[in-house]
Amino acid sequence: MKKRGIFILSAAVVLAAGLLCRHMLVQEREPEFVFSYAENQTEDYPTTLGAKEFAKLVEKRSNGRIQILVQAEGALGTESDVIAQIQYGGIDFARVSLSQLAEYIPELNVLQMPYLYTNSDHMWKVLDGEIGDAFLAATDESELVGLSWYDAGARNFYNSKKPITCLEDMAGMRIRVQESEVMVDMVEALGATALPIPYADVYSALERGTVDGAENNWPSYEAMNHYEVAKYYTVDEHNRVPEMQICSKNTWNKLSEDDQKMILDCAKESALYERKLWTEREADSKEMALKQGVEVVELSAAEKKRFQEAVMGVYEKYCADYMDVIEQIIAQNNK
């Protein structure tokens, strides 16, 4: 009986050891896929944190089979470079500005028309519905897969010269814009000179006087320390341009249908996470900028209407074939 007990105990120990070794082998097994993710913002920026949440969700739900390595601060190139690389599979995933993406997919210009949305609720009602889904699908012809919409807040003007309180104050201003024809035309329609300059070079351009001002959201203004060299911030909310999470079609086609669905679900969940972070960060960034002595001007409703009327030519130039979609977007605000 004693020998039998010892045998049973020994067998149990061997079995347990075997299970432990098997568990360790599973844990140490190389992932089936290791994908790259390009992000040009800082490590603590909402879009970067959203990307990391996306990567974490994918790794967890794939049981470690799929890893996504997020590389922030423009480590993989400018947004324009990243889009080009994603098209041929050199980069797998990215979060990019719609202004950059519209250079490849012209119909996306609709979503960056100035003064298109009344507020953020209006924008999300559009993007989280059928209209937004149709625009995500529009990436297909450019060797891309649109996954989800990230928040980038409302863009406003800021400068180093004077408070902008009316349309006439824009005259003669040299304003940095993204590399986007729509943004260039919008700024010039307002009477200023638009100068496309890489995002990372804006601080030095403001400091040297190469430009008088720029336009961006509160978190970008604060994160890049632009308040140090441009203390006049005018809230006009000329653009609510969302960001899009995209995947290379080359990468997408390597995945099973189940993995594709899982990644889409993770992307949409990470977008909700990012939007929450954005709202919090926007409030914090504004508070910090105010503490640094930034002078904030809120355009009056009457003056904002003048700004809106000044840019109507931009709609006619870029969206003549999409006015029905624009009407649908505007109508969403009344539902």
Where are these regions (language model features)?
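N-terminal secretory/targeting leader peptides
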Residues: K2-D121, I131, T139-K335
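Thiol/selenol-based redox catalytic cores and closely related redox-interacting motifs
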Residues: L136
